[in-house]
From Swiss-Prot:
SUPFAM superfamilies: Actin-like ATPase domain. The gene is glpK. Inhibited by fructose 1,6-bisphosphate (FBP). This is Glycerol kinase. It comes from Nostoc sp. (strain PCC 7120 / SAG 25.82 / UTEX 2576). The keyword Translocase does not apply.
Amino acid sequence: MQISSSGYILALDLGTTGNRAFIFNNAGKIVAQAYKELTQHYPQPGWLEHDAEEIWQDTCWVMKTAIVNAQISPSEIAAIGLTVQRETCLLWDKTTGRPLHKAIVWQDRRTAPLCHQLQEKGYAQEIYSRTGLVVDAYFSATKLRWLLDYITGVDLKNVLAGTIDTWILWKLTGGKVHATDHSNASRTMLMNLKTGEWDEQLLEILQIPAHILPQIQPSLGKFGVTDTSLLDAAIPITAILGDQQAALFGHGCDRPGLMKCTYGTGSFLVAHTGSNIVRSQHQLISTIAWTQADKQENINIGYALEGSMFTSGACIQWLRDGIKLIKTAAETETMANQVADNGGVYFVPAFSGLGAPYWDMNARGAFFGITASVQPQHLVRAVLEAIAYQVLEVVQAINASCSSPMQRLIVDGGACENNFLMQFQADVLGIPVERPTMRDTTVQGAAFAAGLAVGFWDSYTALVNQRQIDRIFEPGEGSQNATANFAIWQKAVKRSLDWV
């Protein structure tokens, strides 16, 4: 990799459970970082909100702390890359700069009734055709509609709407830039996948005024500069990506046949499909990977197929914080290895309904097969197995949708630290699972994109080729049992569908 400049790249990763800042040097290495956990607000069952002001304050804190930890001056930062939890959205007053309500998080299911209305009115196929998405409360459109209905007595001329990237960009630039990128806009259920613009017919269906929405820009490119009152420097913001697209970029999955799975709060398996929109007959969604304008200002669009599984790492968090079965996430690996099998117990991780390939907003979580001989270790093992089984279903759907089957799964995210889970994943898939040394691929992708966009680095291929592999998990002797148990797990899932 030819290093074309000195200095640093600041990458912000604003996720579901916390907000992080990383400083990368010109060799593509992390020199400092900072993290702040984000408060989760559950006003009702099935509802989840974040305080957008808290996200902004935490963003400021992690930026400044990472810069101090790196012992550098803000003026040495060549560019900022931003990656965010997708779909989560809010409205704010552009005069006061204050949110009008807490942000509604992607996992929130309050708009399921509105989604059912859209389906009953026959809009599902139209929405899928235009956006590549299924009608689901997961996406931003119905959340924005709910906010517009709930918040009364405001002058819409003063209201701005956006996902978390738009909110933070607006704040970083001192209220000067109201924009988003194609990867985040493609998750709103309001952007036309072919044109890359807000779709007038969908805005009409959902009665969302176009003027409150941000301008859509290429993922790699200049979005603006930081207000000097923040860091005493006007730093260019040159990349914005949804978190899963950032991980795809960080792994070097930039062409058809390459895919990755991120095990975070949910699990997200994304396959790059090149410049073509691939439509799945197996309940996968078509989305944008990332976009970039060429020298002639033509926008090059990369598309992707995605299977979104809403609950994976969140299950482990629930074992710890909800039912207090474990004290740390790391314990799950030890406990799962303490028993020979799952003891006949199967878990369905449908805390927020089920995503791909079911898209059932009314499914709910459950343990099946509990007997008097079941130990806590069996419950923990069943949860880990369920995470892997969800991924298997999506891999099967991707294999059925693409011309050539997946040969290898590249992984990242917090739960991929779990060796039991990764080995079980290889066993059920029957293919190798590749875990890189750098687990924070999402933030790495944001940094790479920002640095490449500003000319800080000159070769994407060289950056990606630096990736180091920590371990490859090969399918083992557990494959046969894992495959047999998968059929029983699917039976458990069927029992959980349409529960409420």
